[in-house]
């Protein structure tokens, strides 16, 4: 069965319909040798060969000509600052690949991808879990489940965003399954608990390796940065012929939930609850050693013995603490010293990881991106407490997002930001939230830095208000429009009638730069992208497409 989308911007045309039918019945037990380059011919006007940069500002690394830079960093899906059309991707389930390394529910996945193609989405996003791929031992990589997925995505003419997920799955908002770090890594952590982030009371967080040991060979002779780099290099070697084609984007995970931040608000075991301020994560021996060295370097040795003693606990509000209250310690000489170090370490971590990723994927034709968390609670206070504990030095007096945007731009990396769907009026008054103000600040920061901006919704939403907020954000004049939007997440509820119709209308609106109208019940343009058509196609596959 085929879904055709006459107005699609898909670059791929099948050369052999017979092989397409054969691939549809692919077994869940298939194994793959190293994948060969795709056998599709590219026909669109915006093909890799013809595509040009139209950005107002383009970072050119020292020693490289602009022409060479353009060739090495060609866009993988069409969009520019002068093009209002925004491609929409959909996140796949967290357990898309099973713990045994196979594609989960391949028949349902096939039907779901067919439906998404019919809805006009550009592609899908999947997590490449460190805990799955390298679980059998150091540098022993198993990409088989992802190979199955890539072939299936390609068959449907979709694109793929792949997240290099170096964090644990489980224990945070929306986590529906548990995928820990690789067993051999957990073994090293059991021997040396300081390898993971630690709060002031000594609680260890196993979500992600502490950035304090980034350059220390603590993982069986390799540093964490080397381990992450080897993982990414293995991915490039395995899927060489697909990166820059069906694999349009590589998102580099840089912390918990794949975000560049500290795990300051862990939900597991009720440690944190919204809208708590969270806690600083700087008490493993590697972070404490770094803090001490930084304090000594500026002649303030006594400041390096510990983090702030008056910063409260996870569930506190800012005014409950001496550090975060209106005129608190955050605004003192000591507070500025500590936040410069704490946020600086996070920036350094991101810089090292993105530098490595750029070296590995440069010239592949795929975009590189990284994710920054949308921490919107207490944004309307002076200290922005929840942002500070996460590592974003953003206060009434200090812009925390411009340095991040500049660091992303240095490496030619797209900044992917969450909470694009949220409105201020939807938030509880006591939490002093402003997701809209936060998004505007990040838009302005990326515009000022010359960095591309992409977006995600932070929470599972299906209503027109949430979709409308994303559309409004994209066409806002306050800063950068979006280069892409990734919807969270494909599941059973997404395929329900009204929810599905909202998604189809949203995709069309984003393609039209936010100026689209509600979809007609009849097709008068021959686009195959109207409600009646989609409902008919979904009805044929609804049982298979509804992933649990």
From Swiss-Prot:
Q: Where in the cell is it found?
A: Plastid, Chloroplast
Name the principal localization, coarsely classed. Answer: plastid
Q: How is its activity regulated?
A: Redox regulation; active in reducing conditions, inactive in oxidizing conditions.
Q: Where is the transit peptide?
A: 1-49
Q: What is its EC number?
A: 3.2.1.2
**Which GO terms are recorded in the biological process aspect for this UniProt protein?**
maltose biosynthetic process; response to cold; starch catabolic process
Q: Where is the composition biased (Polar residues)?
A: 1-11, 22-31
What is a single cellular component term in the Gene Ontology annotation? cytosol
Instruction: Return the protein name.
Output: Beta-amylase 3, chloroplastic
Source organism per entry reads: Arabidopsis thaliana (Mouse-ear cress)
Gene name, please?
Answer: BAM3
């Amino acid at each position: 069965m085929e879904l055709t989308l006459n107005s699609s911007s898909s670059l791929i045309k099948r050369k052999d319909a017979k092989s397409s039918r054969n691939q549809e019945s692919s077994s869940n037990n298939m194994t793959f040798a190293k994948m060969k380059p795709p056998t599709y011919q590219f026909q669109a006007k915006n093909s890799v060969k013809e595509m040009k940069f139209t950005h107002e500002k383009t970072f050119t690394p020292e020693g490289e000509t602009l022409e060479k830079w353009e060739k090495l960093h060609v866009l993988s899906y069409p969009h520019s600052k002068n093009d209002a059309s925004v491609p929409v991707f959909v996140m796949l389930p967290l357990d898309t690949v099973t713990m045994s390394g196979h594609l989960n529910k391949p028949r349902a996945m096939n039907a779901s991808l067919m439906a998404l193609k019919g809805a006009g989405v550009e592609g899908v996003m999947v997590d490449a879990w460190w805990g799955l791929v390298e679980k059998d031992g150091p540098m022993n990589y198993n990409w088989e489940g992802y190979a199955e997925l890539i072939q299936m995505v390609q068959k449907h003419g979709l694109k793929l965003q792949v997240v290099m997920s170096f964090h644990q799955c489980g224990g945070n908002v929306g986590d529906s399954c548990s995928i820990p770090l690789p067993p051999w890594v957990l073994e090293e952590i059991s021997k040396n608990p300081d390898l993971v982030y630690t709060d002031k009371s000594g609680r260890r967080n196993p979500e992600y390796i502490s950035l304090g040991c980034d350059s220390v060979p603590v993982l069986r002779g390799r540093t964490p940065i080397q381990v992450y780099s080897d993982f990414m290099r293995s991915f490039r070697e395995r899927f060489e012929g697909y990166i820059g084609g069906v694999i349009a984007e590589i998102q580099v995970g840089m912390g918990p939930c794949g975000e560049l931040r500290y795990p300051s608000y862990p939900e597991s075991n009720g440690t944190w609850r919204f809208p708590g301020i969270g806690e600083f994560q700087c008490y493993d021996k590697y972070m404490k050693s770094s803090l001490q060295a930084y304090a000594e370097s500026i002649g303030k040795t006594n400041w390096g013995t510990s983090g702030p003693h008056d910063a409260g606990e996870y569930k506190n509000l800012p005014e409950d603490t001496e550090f975060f209250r209106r005129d608190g310690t955050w605004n003192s000489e000591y507070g500025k010293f500590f936040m410069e170090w704490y946020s600086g370490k996070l920036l350094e971590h991101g810089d090292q990881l993105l530098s490595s990723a750029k070296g590995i994927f440069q010239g592949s034709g795929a975009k590189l991106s990284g994710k920054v968390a949308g921490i919107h609670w207490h944004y309307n206070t002076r200290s922005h407490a929840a942002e500070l504990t996460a590592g974003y030095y953003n206060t009434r007096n200090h812009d925390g997002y411009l340095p991040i945007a500049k660091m992303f731009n240095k490496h030619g990396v797209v900044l992917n930001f969450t909470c694009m769907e949220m409105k201020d009026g939807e938030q509880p008054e006591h939490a002093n939230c402003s997701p809209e103000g936060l998004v505007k600040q990040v838009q302005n920061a990326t515009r000022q830095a010359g960095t591309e901006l992409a977006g995600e919704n932070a929470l599972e939403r299906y209503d027109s208000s949430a979709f409308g907020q994303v559309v409004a954000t994209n066409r806002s004049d306050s800063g950068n429009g979006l280069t892409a939007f990734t919807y969270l997440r494909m599941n059973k509820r997404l395929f329900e009638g009204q929810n599905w119709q909202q998604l189809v209308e949203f995709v069309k609106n984003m393609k039209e730069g936010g100026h689209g109208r509600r979809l007609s019940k009849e097709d008068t343009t021959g686009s195959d992208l109207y409600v009646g058509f989609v409902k008919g196609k979904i009805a044929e596959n609804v049982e298979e497409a509804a992933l649990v």
